[in-house]
Amino acid sequence: MRKLKFVYVRIDVEKHFVETSGIRFYDFYCGIGNKPNHILVLKGCPSDSLYHKGLCLEYMSNEQIHSFIQSDSCHHGDFCWVDFAQEENLNYISDKELSELLFIAHKFEPLDGIKFNSINNRYIYCSHDDEYLTRIYMDAEKYIDVIEFVVLDHLKQKNKILFSGEIKDILFQLCQSGIIFDFEQKSDRIKLYIVQEKIKIDDIHKRLATFRKQENGWYLMMKDNEWTLDRL
């Protein structure tokens, strides 16, 4: 079983992306409400996939995604993809769109916008070593569902009580400053540290002990069968 020490989440509302460390593709897929129907693989080597000759790219069906998240192959290396609605959508990707997709695979950021009309995508997903560093371009407010999944999965609650709308709204606001969810201590409450700066993922790992000493964080905990956020 994976021992989760911490999760870092920063939401950039203006640029429409979520940057994380400690959250796997498995967590994203299980937690997100609107799951991708298919994914076009821009970077990475899934063991079970289909090949589109026109694009010279691999893609995965919904069934293949289910198999992929259970395999070891999604836990290593870079993995970059966009989702698409129907298989036939791939035939309508223009040369310009293809060049923009390949740019994403190379730079891990979009060249011009996060939506591709031909494939009707909702996500652009770019990760390095699965959980070490991930950036997802999407409707960032919906990412709170993934955080909820990670928290509930970590605590292993038998009767999983979901976050209220109020808790989700507060977490969304806090994530815009950058939050560390600290899972180091075995407890029914989770410490949240506010980063309040743009920071490299490597620095978070190096400075984790420093963040644990700060006093401007929060406790996410269960009280009377509902989630609450209390200041440290």
Locate each region found by the language model.
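Structured alpha/beta or helical-core interaction and ligand-binding surfaces enriched in interleaved
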Residues: 1-232
